[in-house]
């Protein structure tokens, strides 16, 4: 029997098991413990001849197949990963990509794209960014404008989630220029614009953001799909930043009325969340209308549950409690969120911290709360989140007025 080297034996074993849809317990059977099988797959144990014979029998193969060439493994695993979206196939794909240098660049591109999506689904922003950075580099090597634009668009979106606004503006701007210069599809151009409008607004580049939002809306006119809904949502969010709440509400409502939740339930839920946030940002706030949006979103949550969506709704409930003067409820919700691994974008995480400091100010810890808000505003400014920094200063001023003069009852923040 040939000596089978680790960790390649473990990788091959896991690939063969996954291809057959077997659990570790099913493959181990009566002749082996699942713990031992797990250590073999991870490369922690060297396989004995007896173990190899047992596993080959369970898999219905000859022991020599454990030496399977890795040259074709990326294509095989890519087929597995595209036909079955699971953590296990994605982990196999991640392993295959690590040793895939020299293989077909198009296969590597597909693999990196899928791995980025996998990390995004799990809310692992840093992991996603790592794969997308490699995807951007590989796209430049391949040289196809479509692939470059798509990789840069996704990369810009992940940078925005991490709060890295300057490189996000650069990546989204390059993706948009590629789409225009190479006359790429309307879909590619609109996808780049979705990110570009958001990051330009966050960087305080309002004239650019407005111009690009108009271009985006013109591009999706006549559609009623996910891209159309996202375009209206993005343009509406820009109106909110400019304080044009009535115009924002018209755009959000148009998207809610015209978009079928069966098309993309996650987008439908996020539109409801955006509308609820709008009702809380209006002057005066409309907590009852926000409550109705939250309830509609929560009713649909079991059908599209992700940690990020659950956390977005919990954050919204905390802000609603704050607006209604239910400070103990707001604190309890924030504490519960603080005990979980947050899967929220950078801006949403900062807004949670802002709310926590507002609650401190209103409970009498004025100096500590103000110092916390000042630090957050300065950090946002340093990260070029100009819009967010201005919002924090405005909320600090409103909160102080409310604490000192009880201005506007439950309407602050």
Question: Where are each of the predicted segments found?
Answer:
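Helix-turn-helix repeat elements of alpha-solenoid scaffolds
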Residues: 82-95, 120-134, 164-176, 202-215, ...
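A short, Lys/Arg-rich alpha-helix, primarily the initiator
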Residues: 1-19
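Short alpha-helical DNA-recognition segment
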Residues: 18-39
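DNA major-groove recognition helix of helix-turn-helix/homeodomain DNA-binding modules
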Residues: 48-65
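Conserved small-residue packing positions in alpha-helical repeats and bundles
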Residues: 77-84, 116, 156, 197, ...
């Amino acid at each position: 029997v040939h000596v089978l080297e680790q960790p390649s034996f473990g990788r091959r074993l896991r690939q063969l098991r996954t291809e057959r849809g077997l659990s570790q317990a099913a493959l181990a059977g009566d002749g082996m413990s699942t713990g031992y099988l797990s250590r073999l797959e991870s490369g922690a144990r060297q396989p004995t001849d007896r173990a190899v014979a047992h596993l080959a029998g369970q898999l219905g193969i000859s022991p020599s197949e454990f030496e399977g060439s890795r040259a074709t493994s990326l294509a095989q695993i890519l087929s597995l990963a595209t036909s079955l979206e699971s953590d296990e196939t994605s982990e196999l794909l991640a392993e295959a990509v690590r040793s895939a240098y020299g293989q077909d660049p198009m296969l590597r591109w597909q693999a990196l794209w899928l791995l980025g999506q996998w990390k995004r689904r799990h809310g692992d922003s840093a992991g996603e960014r790592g794969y997308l950075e490699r995807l951007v580099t590989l796209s430049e090597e391949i040289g196809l404008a479509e692939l470059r634009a798509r990789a840069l668009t996704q990369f810009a979106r992940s940078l925005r989630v991490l709060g890295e606004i300057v490189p996000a503006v650069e990546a989204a701007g390059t993706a948009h220029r590629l789409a225009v210069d190479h006359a790429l599809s309307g879909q590619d151009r609109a996808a780049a614009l979705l990110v570009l409008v958001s990051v330009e607004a966050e960087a305080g580049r309002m004239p650019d953001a407005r111009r690009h939002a108009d271009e985006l809306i013109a591009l999706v006119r006549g559609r009623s799909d996910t891209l159309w809904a996202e375009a209206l949502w993005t343009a509406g969010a820009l109106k909110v930043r400019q304080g044009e709440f009535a115009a924002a509400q018209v755009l959000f409502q148009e998207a809610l009325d015209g978009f079928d939740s069966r098309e993309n339930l996650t987008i439908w839920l996020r539109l409801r969340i955006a509308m609820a946030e709008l009702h809380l940002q209006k002057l005066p706030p409309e907590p009852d209308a926000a409550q109705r949006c939250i309830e509609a979103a929560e009713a649909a949550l079991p059908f599209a549950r992700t940690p990020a969506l659950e956390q977005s709704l919990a954050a919204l409930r905390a802000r609603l409690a704050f607006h209604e003067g239910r400070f103990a409820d707001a604190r309890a919700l924030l504490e519960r969120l603080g005990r979980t691994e947050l899967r929220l974008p950078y801006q949403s995480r900062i807004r949670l911290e802002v709310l926590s400091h507002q609650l401190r100010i209103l409970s009498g810890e004025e100096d500590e709360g103000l110092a916390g808000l000042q630090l957050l505003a300065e950090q946002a400014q340093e990260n070029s989140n100009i819009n967010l920094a201005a919002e924090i200063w405005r909320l600090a001023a409103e909160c102080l007025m409310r604490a000192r003069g009880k201005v506007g009852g439950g309407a602050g923040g």
